[in-house]
Structure formats: structure tokens, C-alpha cells
Amino acid sequence: MAGPGSLCCASRGASALLATALLYAALGDVVRSEQQIPLSVVKLWASAFGGEIKSIAAKYSGSQLLQKKYKEYEKDVAIEEIDGLQLVKKLAKIMEEMFHKKSEAVRRLVEAAEEAHLKHEFDADLQYEYFNAVLINERDKDGNFLELGKEFILAPNDHFNNLPVNISLSDVQVPTNMYNKDPAIVNGVYWSESLNKVFVDNFDRDPSLIWQYFGSAKGFFRQYPGIKWEPDENGVIAFDCRNRKWYIQAATSPKDVVILVDVSGSMKGLRLTIAKQTVSSILDTLGDDDFFNIITYNEELHYVEPCLNGTLVQADRTNKEHFREHLDKLFAKGIGMLDIALNEAFNILSDFNHTGQGSICSQAIMLITDGAVDTYDTIFAKYNWPDRKVRIFTYLIGREAAFADNLKWMACANKGFFTQISTLADVQENVMEYLHVLSRPKVIDQEHDVVWTEAYIDSTLPQAQKLADDQGLVLMTTVAMPVFSKQNETRSKGILLGVVGTDVPVKELLKTIPKYKLGIHGYAFAITNNGYILTHPELRPLYEEGKKRRKPNYSSVDLSEVEWEDRDDVLRNAMVNRKTGKFSMEVKKTVDKGKRVLVMTNDYYYTDIKGTPFSLGVALSRGHGKYFFRGNVTIEEGLHDLEHPDVSLADEWSYCNTDLHPEHRHLSQLEAIKLYLKGKEPLLQCDKELIQEVLFDAVVSAPIEAYWTSLALNKSENSDKGVEVAFLGTRTGLSRINLFVGAEQLTNQDFLKAGDKENIFNADHFPLWYRRAAEQIAGSFVYSIPFSTGTVNKSNVVTASTSIQLLDERKSPVVAAVGIQMKLEFFQRKFWTASRQCASLDGKCSISCDDETVNCYLIDNNGFILVSEDYTQTGDFFGEVEGAVMNKLLTMGSFKRITLYDYQAMCRANKESSDSAHGLLDPYKAFLSAAKWIMTELVLFLVEFNLCSWWHSDMTAKAQKLKQTLEPCDTEYPAFVSERTIKETTGNIACEDCSKSFVIQQIPSSNLFMVVVDSSCLCESVAPITMAPIEIRYNESLKCERLKAQKIRRRPESCHGFHPEENARECGGASSLQAQAALLLLPLVSSLFSR
């Protein structure tokens, strides 16, 4: 029997053995986690897969055949370096001529309108049945046409996107809050009827014209061609032509404005609500050439934005919205000291004028108050008399008229205007009065300035909603001119009759640009006198949240926000100043929804477009982008090869102008070219140089059709139907497509279709597969898959493409790109087959992708996963899956991080929102809100109630709640690019309790890398690397500096601030426009009955 000592020894021995075993186990773990993945084996896998997949891609794309065919013509082509300056000057001249045609059409409308008005005598009893755009073709319950709604023939027209229109007549829209048969409107409609024949004549002269119109100062809107207008779901048409930018810009000159708002105690409640709405309506009338500030006053002065104390700010969309947010914070208390406010306003206007930064034209003070106890003539005598350069516009808020005389005197003594605003319904009409006063000098001068708006999307018009393209609503600019009264007896009054205009879609500009001469990455762009983008391929005016919506600041995106690498604004400022020249810089251009980046050097060439406020620029990328070549084949040869059914041309490129004659509008570009070459349509105008190159490409690429057909017929060549599509595109926009499977069997049904904008030739870019192939080494293929493919079954494809160069040098133009699309499953199967190979004679591999200790990936040159054992990771960024390895690759220089900026981003923000609808937007809620208000404000109701104030009331408590909204913001985000010179890398990562090894090996002749990672060491202490954008948040002082900062801009060339003959006695009265009760009740009643 063993004693205690023996037991103790035995216990110690067991413990020692256990400790030894644990030590060996731990050492085993360390050894296993530090085991080196054999580079030679990974290199073998990469070589096997690379050879196999390139063989498939080259074979099915026909790349070698096409390269050979172009080489055969090498001696017969002439290579030219593109002269960027000459190109941009030529383009500017073409655009100048196009713009001039549009402005001449508008000028003819001006002459006709003024002549018609001169001959017309106002008749207060005039009875005239006109075509009301809302009522046309409407019948009553007995089947009779409604009054003003007689029969108006409408027919679909392909030039207007098959909208039903009447190209013989215009019709008239009257705002909902105005009386259709008001004598002023009936007389205006009557004499403006003579514009019909000019509308038709303009359209005959220039069939590319779209909407032509006359916006009357009385509020009605005459539009050609005539179209049916449909009210919104509340029975309302909110459109009023007088608050559109084109109207305001044409009617007035640039202005500096200080808005003074009385926030004394007497302004509480309804009055303050009306005052806020009045300020908001004034802001609506200010444009990018105007400057403003808002000051509130009681015993003290309060700048609505304290940061902008003592200065004015440009009235762009961002700044106006910033001030609107501050308006909601206003409250009334104390006593109003107007003298202090007036002194401050005059000093600001004087000081700002001396800086030379403002409009240097008209100046005005807008006073919004419920009364003034004095006329403050000593202040006006000190600052404004005798010249009266600052106009005073006074808005009396409320029904009380005790102090109306003082306010009216101020306005009349300072060439301004006085109005009284009793209800919210009065605001819009009364605010518009000041525009007509400011237009007087221009009218007396009889200066018909041509104005062009910035790019905008006018979704308030029903036809704009329907004239949408695949990308959303159409971006356009408007050319407009004012129409004046020429009657002698009204000359000194300077009566503005209205504004005429026509819209010019931005895509019309793009049609004039020869994309084939700009190279694969080249593009043209244009900006306004304020530096805002008119057209640029990087402009993104829409965002998606359920449906496509306009970004709030889309029309004021500055050139510096898309060409952000130009930190000193050298390019922008030169273009704003209408200079002609050249500028170069390295740029980082994103492709594929912004997730990939191409780093290149661009040469920019720029000049002005005469007769407009626009400047034009052209960007050419260095290297192959600066060269162009001319081939030569006979028309007979080329025409024969264009007849093949697999040939298509870029629909958005302008080979022939099919807009000039109505009979050509139905033609595709390919059909137009064929008719042109056959001489069957002598009226067709075509780009001879481009067509010659199209014929050359058609001839050279023709043999590939027979090649693809032979592959398709030999079913054994593609027995598992892995390869589905072969395609090619040339520098002239010519495409050929071949299907190796039936159309219904295609995995990606959208590929190369019209809706697949990224992968087809567009007005402003080459297909994505073409652009990426051009940046690859000649002879290699670029492979890609849609992002997050693992979650989207229909897109489980791999696209492979390669470029075709004419010469074996960097200066060679990239003449074409060819490629294939194959099933992702087929592609991945080839990868896994290759990764099972090994060089061991006994066939026993030291390592395999099937091993649990390793993870194998196939990633591209931007770090996106094409193959992973976890299928759901397909299309994800490698750094999100293997953060530690990606971090090491960045440290070692195998990949580099490139920081990018997005100044057009939309970020989520929490905002207070009201449950109360405003005005006519929701009659039912307006009714309930009004009822509550009537009960709680009975006394005020008895004194001030009328139908307008009842209709528009949301006077009292608004239920506030936090709501997530998308708002414009600036973001920063990374993109990643592999270092081409590094072909292979091995590495070890020291983690907390283990070491993680990996091997990365480039796949030959591709943009791909095989990455094999030791999976036994998780290395969870290293965070994933994400590509998610981060909002750039600015502190208060920086926000203030950004608000104050004003980029260089060019003022409009004309200014009509004053005229000595102006009759200042027309300065307003105390009456306010009352809307008709029945008219206002109609939408409410119909809304209530429909519920």
C-alpha cells in the first residue's frame, strides 16, 4: 500500500505530464498559426487559372482576330494629336449658333407680343372664350363642354415624347387662386392670342424647339404647343409663372436686398406667421445674381444668421434654405425700434456696395411690420436723398390700417411700393408687386436683355413630369426676354407685360459634342457666370429614396465641387472670367457607381460661349486620350458591313441631325446614316468625318461576326454554356453583340440594353467595360462583377474585356474594346479547379483551398471579391472580410488607399417636422387646423376672419416630432488600387495571441489577384476596413467662414437700376387682393366628399 509520499509524487508527475502536454499543444498551435503558405503552390494555382480564363476570354471575345484586323490597316491610317484649343473653340462656335437660334425665336415672340398689345384697347366688359389648359375637353354631367373648356384637339407627338399636344395652337393656364374671367386676364389672353402664329412659325424654322411660352405679369401662362394640365390630388395647380426663375431673371436686374422684420410684441400670433411667409416668398424671388440678409428688430437688432453680421450673402439655394431654417426660430416680444433697423440696413448696403462683391446694380430694403409711428424722413434724408438709390418696399401685416400712411409715405418717397397683407392668401400676390417696380427702369430703357437660367428641372409643370428620360426628369436651361408696354401714355410707368421664353434641354448641347474626338475618358462641360455647372458628366441632380427625387441644391453645384482636385480654383476662375486657355492636373475619376477610381492626368481647354453667360471646357486625358486616327474605306464597303443585324450605334451620339425635319424624327441614327449614304434623304445633315470612321470600323470589325457564329455553331466549344455573350465597341460608338445562348436564357437580361447606362455608349461617357479595359496593360483582360453579387441572383455574371490598340506604344489610340460575359458559377468553378493543382509527383498537395486552415479569395485590382468560399461575400470589399490582411497589404504597398470627396452627397439628419399641412397642400388638415384655430382665437376670428385666412390657417400649435430626412452634405470616402509593379507578396501579421500568414499572387494577364489566408488565426483585434463614406462635419467657426466665403463670379453685363423718367407715384395702396370664396372652397369641398 502506497504511503502519502508516493501519492504526492504520483500527483506531481501527473501534473508535470499534463503541463508538458499543454505546452506541446500550445506550441503546436503556434507552429500551425505561423506555418508559411507555400508561394510556389499559390503561384502555380494563379498561373493555371490565369492561363485558362484568358484562353476562354480571348477565344470567345475574338480579341486576337480583331487586333490582327486593325493591324492589317496600320499603314493606311493617319494618327493625329488632338488640338484641344482648336476643338473647344470649334465646339463653342457650334453652341453659340445653336443658342442664337433659340434666342432669335424668343425675340420674334417679344416683337409680336409688344405689337399686339400696342394695338389692343383694354375693354373691361370683354367676353372671350379662350382655351383654358385645365378645362379643355371637359364636359358637364349633360355632356356639354364646360365654359372655357371647349374641344381642343390633342394628338401624340414623338418630338414631345408622345405627349398629346396641339401643334397648331397654344392654350392658357391660370393659377388656382386667380379668377379665370378676371377682365385683366381676359384682355391679356385676347391680345396674346396673336402669338399662336409666331409659335408655329418658330417651330417650323427650328423643329428642335420644345416648349415656347408667354408668362403674363397678370399671372396667366400661355404655352405652345397646347397641352392638357391636370390638377394634383388636391385639385390644385400651384404653378404661377411669375415666381419662376426665368421670369424673375428676365423681368428685373440683379439686386442687393436687406429684409427687416418687426418682431416686437404686437407681431405675435397670426401676424408673425404671415411675416415669416412673406420673407419666405421674397426669398423665392431672389436668384444667384442677387445678395441679401435678414435682420429682425425690437428694442435691439438681431441678425437672423449672427455669423453674417454687417454683410450680405449670395442668394443661392443653399443660403436661402439656411435662412429659412432660422426663420422658424423667430418669436415676438418688446417694442419695435425701426430707426435703429433702418440705419443698419442703409449702412450694410453702402458698405457692401463699396466691397465690389455685390450686384452693383439695384438696392432695396424690404420692411415687414404691423406699423410705423413715424416717417423717419431724417434717416432717408441722411442716407438716400436726393438720388434715392435704395428703394423701400413696405409690407403692412394685418388688417389694421392706423399706421398705413407712414409706411406708404416711406415707400413712395423712396421709389418703392406699399402693400397690405391681411392673410396668408395675400402673401404671394403682394410680394410679386416689388418685381414690377424693379422692372420699370428696364422697361423705360426698352432694353430687351436676353437671359439664360442655370440648369434646372422644372417638375412643377405636368409636361416636365412626362418629358422624363431614363435617368429621370430632363435637365434644361431657359432663354427668356421681357415684354414691355410701348403705349406712349404709360411709358413713364414702365409697365412690364410679361416674359417670353423657350426651354433648351441640356442633352441638346451634348448632341453637338463629338464624343469620338474626346477619347475614352474625355468629356465636355459648361458652367455659368457664377461657376455653377450647366452640364458635366459628374453632375448628379437626382437621388433615390423610394423614387428619384431632385437634390435641393442640384442647380447650384459649383465646378470646384466636381473638379475638386483643383484646390486653387485655377480652372474655375479662368472659365468664370471668360478666358481662353489650357490647364492640366492629376485627377481621380470614379467609375462603377463611385466605387472604383482611375488616376490620370487631364488637360483642360476652355473658352467662352458668346452671347450667353456660359463658358465651355473640354477635358482630354493624357496618353491614348490625346490621339485620334483616320481610316479610309469606300462607302460601298462600309455600307455593306453596316447592314449586318448585329451592328448598332450609340443612340445618344449625333451622327445625323434627325431633329431638323419632322419626317426624320422617327429614324434611328443607324437608319439615318444608311439613308444619307444612299442619297435618299438629301435634307439630312450628318457628320461626314464621324460617318467615315464608322464605315472604317464596320469594315474592320465585320469578320468577327463570322468568327462568333462559327463558335456558336460548334456546341462542343461551349458545352456547358458558361460563356453567354460576346461584344465589342469601337471609338466611333459602333457596337456588335453575339449571344451564345438564347436571349431568354441570359443570366443578366439587362446587359447592354438601353437601361444599362453604365455599359452602353452615352452622350457623356464610353461604356464602363471599355473605360476600364483602356487602362489595363495591352493584351490583358479586366474582369469585374456587380457589387454585392452574392445577394442579387440575376446579376451572377462576370464581365471580361480587353482593349484593342492600333500601335504598340502609349501614344496609340485605343480603337476598340472587346469582351465576354460569363456565368459567375462557371468562372468560379474554373478557379476552384485550378486551386486543386499541385506539382507533387505523388499528387499529395501540401496545401489546398479545400483545407479548413486556409481561406482562398480571388480579388480584383480595386479589392473587390470575385470568388470566396463564402458565396455571400462575392462582390464585397476584401477589407470588410479580411481587415487585418488588407491593412497589411496597404502597409506593404501592394495596395494604396486614395481619399475621395463627394460634395453632392445626401446624408441622413434628424429634423423637427410638423404634422400640419400648409396652405392648399392638404385641404382636409387645413380644415381641421382652421376649426381648432377658430375655437381658440374667437376674438381674432371676429375681427380678422375671412375665407382666405381660414383656408390658409395653421396658425397655432404644430405637432412637432423628429423625422429622419436626407439633406445635402459633404462626404469623404476611400477607394483602393493595386500597385501594378508588385506581382506577389507574402506576409505575416502579429495578432494578439497568434500570427496570421498570407500570400497574394497576381493572376497573369488580368487585373486579378489570388489571396490565400491562414484562417486558423482570426486576428479579430484588427477592425475591418470599410469603404463607407463619412460625413465631413464643420465646426461653427468653419461653417461661418464657408457662409461668408464668396467665390469669384462674373456679374451679368447689363444693369437697369434707375431711370430719370420713372414715375415713382405708382407706389401702392392699402387694398389687398381677395380670392373668390367659391373658388377657394371648391378643392376643400371635393376633398371632404372624396374621403
Swiss-Prot record:
Q: Per UniProt, which keywords does this protein have?
A: Calcium, Calcium channel, Calcium transport, Disulfide bond, Glycoprotein, Ion channel, Ion transport, Membrane, Metal-binding, Phosphoprotein, Signal, Transmembrane, Transmembrane helix, Transport, Voltage-gated channel
- All copies of the VWFA domain together span 256-438
Report how it sits in the membrane: Single-pass type I membrane protein
Q: Where are the transmembrane segments?
A: 1069-1089
Sugar attachment sites:
N166, N309, N553, N632
Q: Which GO terms describe its cellular component?
A: GABA-ergic synapse; monoatomic ion channel complex; presynaptic active zone membrane
Q: Report if keyword Chloroplast is assigned.
A: no
Q: Please report a single Pfam family linked to this protein.
A: VWA_N
Q: List the disulfide bonds.
A: C412-C1055
The modified positions for Phosphotyrosine read Y924
Q: Give the Cytoplasmic compartment stretches of this protein.
A: 1090-1091
Per the record, the major location class is membrane
As annotated in Swiss-Prot or TrEMBL, what is the tissue specificity of this protein? Brain-specific. Predominantly expressed in the caudate putamen, entorhinal complex, hippocampus and cortex.
- What further note is attached to this protein's record? In contrast to CACNA2D1 and CACNA2D2, it does not bind gabapentin, an antiepileptic drug.
Q: What is known of its domains?
A: The MIDAS-like motif in the VWFA domain binds divalent metal cations and is required to promote trafficking of the alpha-1 (CACNA1) subunit to the plasma membrane by an integrin-like switch.
Q: Which family does it belong to?
A: Belongs to the calcium channel subunit alpha-2/delta family.
Q: What is this protein called?
A: Voltage-dependent calcium channel subunit alpha-2/delta-3
Query: Which species does the entry assign this protein to?
Result: Mus musculus
List the top taxonomic levels of the source: Eukaryota, Metazoa, Chordata, Craniata, Vertebrata
